[in-house]
Curated annotation (Swiss-Prot):
Name by which UniProt lists this protein: Streptokinase G
InterPro entries assigned: SAK, SAK/SK_sf, SK
Keywords: Plasminogen activation, Signal, Virulence
GO cellular component terms given for this protein: extracellular region
Length: 440
């Protein structure tokens, strides 16, 4: 008799009906496969939600994928954080199934659950799978758990499996400390990100350094950390200064439940109480005490010295353009629009049928607006006043049978850059219109 994938209660059936991938909610509906790119390796898509024990509250999780063909290296973890127990088993036929351990799946879901937590009060602990958690393939075949709670999935042919449903969670509570740590090595690493768009900034490789060794309850302030960050910035990026702190997070002895420090106010971090750390002495085989560790990871926004923060609502650097498209024979206004741009180099013609031109502001045809069969005549008027630059583009009907982009100046496949440059009338202020604008 087959076992339901209970992972503890033998009540957990993994049934799989693929659905639309939602970044925060479970997958639903078979049409989701049509929108996903094809995969090269068999994958398990994990799209579950958390249900808080004893309540009706649901916790959303972003879906993630597990590559079923990755192999653990040298007894370590795979890319997905699965232990060496979750491994491939070769068979004589070449069909290589992948064994997924229950504990590994729960751990991967736990890590995803806390990945986007922004407050220490938002931590939840994954207890187990709920009874509606199911795994199937794209054909609806159900995969059941073995007696040990593991599930074995074939990886040939290449396909995607889905784990959906719920996991049971509860608010995270720290366990009482039985053997308090004696000292903690406080390590520090920092990452800098330019506040303004900045092509010159080259982030240095993150380096971890030992700040100090403290006892449980000792403190370190936000000002001390800021000074440390500024010192590293001065060394690696002397032309920049810190603008503001983005985040400060403390990882305790590799515990996934970290301490999130305030980002918008001054703070004092008190070294957290925890169990004494040990390691096995290779010679004696006995446990020996070692210093515990706190890794403080910070992120800061930085500015070039003398530069002001970019204001997305500041339009003082933008220029106003009024663009008019006029029928050269009747002077009828075909289309008009006003644009704000920071770069006059964008004031050039683009082909609506060519995505390479998407940054350019002027059209060489108006087909996309339902104004059909027009093209450039070569006649363009460029007028200025104190606040506005008015561009009038005169257009005429293109010859029957010609495509919308036949105009010599912008035919990218038939003419050289030099030939097309002649017809870039507006790219540089003062460039004259060609003498024979009808010869295009």
């Amino acid at each position: 008799m087959k076992n339901y994938l209970s992972f503890g209660m033998f009540a957990l059936l993994f049934a799989l009906t693929f659905g639309t991938v939602n970044s925060v909610q479970a997958i639903a509906g078979p049409e989701w496969l049509l929108d996903r790119p094809s995969v090269n390796n068999s994958q398990l898509v994990v799209s579950v939600a958390g249900t808080v024990e004893g309540t009706n509250q649901d916790i959303s999780l972003k879906f993630f994928e597990i590559d079923l063909t990755s192999r653990p290296a040298h007894g370590g973890k795979t890319e997905q954080g699965l232990s060496p127990k979750s491994k491939l088993f070769a068979t004589d036929s070449g069909a290589m199934p992948h064994k997924l351990e229950k504990a590994d799946l729960l751990k991967a879901i736990q890590e995803q659950l806390i990945a986007n937590v922004h407050s220490n009060d938002d931590y939840f602990e994954v207890i187990d799978f709920a009874s509606d958690a199911t795994i199937t393939d794209r054909n609806g075949k159900v995969y059941f758990a073995d007696k040990d709670g593991s599930v074995t999935l074939p990886i040939q042919p290449v396909q995607e499996f889905l784990l959906k449903g719920h996991v049971r969670v509860r608010p995270y509570k720290e366990k009482p400390v039985q053997n308090q740590a004696k000292s903690v090595d406080v390590e520090y690493t920092v990452q800098f990100t330019p506040l303004n768009p900045d092509d010159d900034f080259r982030p240095a490789l993150k380096d971890t350094k030992l700040l100090k060794t403290l006892a449980i309850g000792d403190t370190i302030t936000s000002q001390e950390l800021l000074a440390q960050a500024q010192s590293i910035l001065n060394k690696n990026h002397p032309g920049y200064t810190i603008y503001e702190r983005d985040s400060s997070i403390v990882t305790h002895d590799n515990d996934i439940f970290r301490t999130i420090l305030p980002m918008d106010q001054e703070f004092t971090y008190h070294v957290k109480n925890r169990e004494q750390a040990y390691r096995i002495n290779k010679k004696s085989g006995l446990n020996e005490e070692i210093n515990n560790t706190d890794l403080i990871s910070e992120k800061y926004y930085v500015l070039k010295k003398g530069e002001k923060p970019y204001d997305p609502f500041d339009r003082s650097h933008l220029k106003l353009f009024t663009i008019k498209y006029v029928d050269v024979n009747t002077n009828e206004l075909l289309k008009s629009e006003q644009l704000l741009t920071a770069s006059e180099r964008n004031l050039d013609f683009r082909d609506l049928y060519d995505p390479r031109d998407k940054a350019k502001l002027l059209y060489n045809n108006l087909d996309a607006f339902g104004i059909m069969d027009y093209t450039l005549t070569g006649k363009v008027e460029d007028n200025h006043d104190d606040t506005n630059r008015i561009i009038t583009v005169y257009m005429g009907k293109r010859p029957e049978g010609e495509n919308a982009s036949y105009h010599l100046a912008y035919d990218k496949d038939r003419y050289t850059e030099e030939e097309r440059e002649v017809y870039s009338y507006l790219r540089y202020t003062g460039t004259p219109i060609p003498d024979n604008p009808n010869d295009k």
